[in-house]
Amino acid sequence: PLGTVQKIFSGETVNPRYDTLLALEHFFEEPLEVREHVYNRYERNGSYTVDDYRTLPDEQRGELIDGYFYDMASSTFGHQSIGGEIHRQIANFIVENGGNCRPFIAPVDVQLDCDEKTMVQPDVGIVCDSSKIQRFGVYGAPDFLVEVISPSTKKKDYTLKLSKYIEAGVREYWIVDYMQEKVLVYFFE
């Protein structure tokens, strides 16, 4: 159940049952219909930089995480609709309440760690520090991020991006699984 998973990831449950751990392990290791992959064919994988990322062809959508390229397939209609609606609701809320934060929707480049090894494209985000908004996109951790998962990005969104967002200083992260009709919300200090 989702409540159990949230308690485990939040640290509330320190010693989960063995069968729960096995179920989680199976979930994260199950074979997926992978349309996204790491660029294994490149010998330099792990040492790529933002400069390499910027040389990708315009039609090639991808992310650079810790020096590794991840190919990103184009979004489905459902995926894009959910992300668009979340963005619309957030933008309306900010305007109606006179807020100064700036919402954005993919594809926007986010140089998450302010280093040369990571550039991600979250589905939706909010930046409250206007100095982070640069000509190319966002430099530094946004305050709020949303990833709408698909079968090909599930593992990366639940694990790799979760840890990257925590380390970078993102304050709130939503994982939206519209196929399961679930939203997992993380609040970070």
Where are the regions a protein language model picked out?
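Short alpha-helical DNA-recognition segment
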Residues: 1-7
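Gly/Pro/Ser/Thr-rich low-complexity, intrinsically disordered segments predominantly at protein N-termini
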Residues: 7-10, 17-189
